[in-house]
Amino acid sequence: IDDESTDNTWKIIYNTIYDHPRKNKVRVCAKNRNRIGVLANHYKMAQMCSDNEVIVNLDGDDELAHKDVLNVLSNVYDTSDIWMTYGSFAYDYESRNPDPNADPRGISGPFPADKHERTYFFVCSHLRTYKKWLFSKIRLEDLKRDGDFYQLAMDHALMFPMIEMSGPDHAKYIHDILYLYNAVNVLNEHTLVGREMVMEV
């Protein structure tokens, strides 16, 4: 889904997929006429998945860390009774890393077995994946405020209820870097932290 981009993204994606030999493996769903936000788009896309399919959250300005990421995830879900996974990601600063000696690893980390609740510091970040049926158990009203989908902190709105439902036996933290987070995009939430984001959380 293209959320009303203004930089020719839609045309580039459409043409790239149309000319690709495996274009039958990709569905280009829609270009929104009005921007509706990340969480609303995630909800919209999830309705197109079957219950046992695994949803992988990848933002358009980020990328998977390597070509075997989906194989890693497939192995996790195929060999254990896992309902959701999270982690791990690295910040991609491109050419303007403010501290070249800084650890690029993001905030994802294992949830203590006795702390599967939303009072614990949020560590369930990229790469986020989950079974569609688990996502469907989140009440729609819990993804909204005053009738509208949350515009910020959508990862909290999604992951807290799912990790509570999964518990330590069915949620898995993956230590290996699977995701590269574009840290130079001025529209990223971590650059927009302020009163609005605090209210959303």
Task: Provide a role label for each language-model segment.
Residues 1-201:
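Nucleotide-sugar donor-binding/catalytic module of glycosyltransferases
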